């Protein structure tokens, strides 16, 4: 099976990476679909985010990294994905993700969204938290892959 894991990944966290590994273990293949959203101002360019993810996942079998814009279900169809993979940290994530999953099912009945609960030690982790800690000079090596930590620290010098 092939899972599509969409997101902005700005930046990739160890929580994302854990979900990717577990997704590959469960489904065999995970397409990491990095959202290209012209209405947002990301910390890292699309190219940087893709390079960071490729670097962090180079040892994981079954990973493909690519960008997309538009509807997730349309991209899932183009990539011949069987399902959409999402992670849940808290009930607040569930409420939002459930709305998106229902919307995706309304748009295309062929796609189920599979939710994986985040490992407890990553439940506090979000890209926003990582950026805020980095901006104030805090330690982020336990939150993100090494390359991401280095690039974030350089960005917030």
UniProtKB/Swiss-Prot annotation:
InterPro entries: Cyt_trans-like, PPAT, Rossmann-like_a/b/a_fold. It is found in: Cytoplasm. Signal peptide: none annotated. ATP binds at residues 8-9, 16, 87-89, 97, 122-128. Pathway: Cofactor biosynthesis; coenzyme A biosynthesis; CoA from (R)-pantothenate: step 4/5. Pfam families: CTP_transf_like. The record marks 16 as: Transition state stabilizer. Gene3D superfamilies: HUPs. Its EC number is 2.7.7.3. SUPFAM superfamilies: Nucleotidylyl transferase. One of its GO terms (biological process) is coenzyme A biosynthetic process. Belongs to the bacterial CoaD family. NCBIfam families: coaD_prev_kdtB, cyt_tran_rel. Reversibly transfers an adenylyl group from ATP to 4'-phosphopantetheine, yielding dephospho-CoA (dPCoA) and pyrophosphate. This is Phosphopantetheine adenylyltransferase. It comes from Prochlorococcus marinus (strain MIT 9211).
């Amino acid at each position: 099976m092939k899972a599509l894991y969409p997101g902005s990944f700005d930046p990739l966290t160890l929580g994302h990476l854990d979900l990717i590994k577990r997704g590959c273990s469960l489904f065999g293949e995970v397409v990491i679909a990095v959202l290209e959203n012209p209405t947002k101002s990301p910390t890292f360019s699309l190219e940087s985010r893709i390079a960071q993810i490729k670097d962090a996942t180079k040892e994981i079998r079954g990973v493909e990294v690519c960008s997309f814009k538009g509807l997730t279900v349309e991209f899932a169809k183009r990539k011949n994905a069987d399902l959409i993979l999402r992670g849940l940290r808290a009930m607040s994530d569930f409420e939002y993700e459930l709305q998106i999953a229902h919307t995706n099912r309304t748009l295309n009945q062929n796609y189920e969204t599979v939710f994986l609960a985040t490992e407890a030690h990553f439940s506090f982790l979000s890209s926003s938290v990582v950026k805020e800690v980095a901006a104030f000079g805090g330690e982020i090596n336990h939150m993100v892959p090494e390359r991401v930590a280095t690039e974030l620290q350089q960005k917030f010098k």
